[in-house]
């Protein structure tokens, strides 16, 4: 299963300006906020979670919330996903791959899910 999402970084900037850090907690946890220092990274994390929801096929819904998947970076700075056990079980997920990129004022993310 593949999911892709793209977002204008300015959209995140505008929402952060309007709502402050309260906005960030709608889709990120404290650790993710500490990792995502720039608005481009925040936008990439948002796109990644949307892409994950699309790969699941259910979108953001009662079956899947933004907080059911977390994004971290490895020692090389590459993003990876930590998926809640209930999501792994409910959707038979064996493995997940994530790629995030930023260019031209946009952030894009692609998620590939491998099912059991």
Label each residue range with its predicted role:
Residues 1-116:
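Core catalytic alpha/beta fold that binds nucleotide/phospho-ligands
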